[in-house]
Design a protein with these regions (language model features):
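Active-site proximal loop and beta-alpha junction motif in alpha/beta enzyme cores
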Residues: 1-151
Length: 151
């Protein structure tokens, strides 16, 4: 799928971030969402964030990420402001997470793993036009019919 990227600005790491995630990030950036960067993959995988404290952080989605051991990065996306405790695999968040790691690792193609309970791989390609292609396996979670009256 073809998505936009968003400008990212480094922001100060705060005590509120540490309280929300239970671990102090080593770096934080803000775009449409907040991305807190942690020291290692294990910290991201094992964290048990405080959903109420996450509500106090900037951005609509609160992301935790670290450089991966077998992938370029590992992440988790928490969305209490959207009434979603944790998004299993968040394409919208990776518009920013992959862009961040692309710059950090100096590469255009990023393989990301979202370490939620369900988990999933995202294959991200940063384009020169400021957009990103994201692919991966999708999981069908609902089927519905929409009924509309046409006049």
């Amino acid at each position: 799928m073809d998505f936009p990227t968003y400008p990212l600005t480094e922001i100060s790491v705060t005590d509120a971030m540490e309280q929300a995630f239970g671990i102090r990030p080593v770096k934080a950036v803000l775009g449409l969402d907040i991305i807190c960067v942690f020291e290692n993959e294990e910290q991201v995988r094992q964290m048990q964030p405080d959903q109420a404290m996450l509500m106090n952080l900037e951005g609509r989605i609160q992301n935790a990420t670290a450089q991966g051991m077998e992938t370029d990065c590992v992440s988790r996306s928490f969305c209490p402001k959207l009434s979603i405790a944790e998004d299993p695999v968040c394409g919208a968040a990776h518009c920013q997470i992959a862009d961040y790691w692309s710059k950090e690792l100096n590469k255009k193609q990023i393989v990301a793993y979202q370490a939620s309970r369900r988990g999933g791989y995202l294959y991200c390609e940063l384009r020169d036009d400021g957009r990103i292609n994201i692919s991966g396996k999708a999981v069908l979670v609902a089927i519905t019919d929409i009924v509309a009256e046409l006049s």
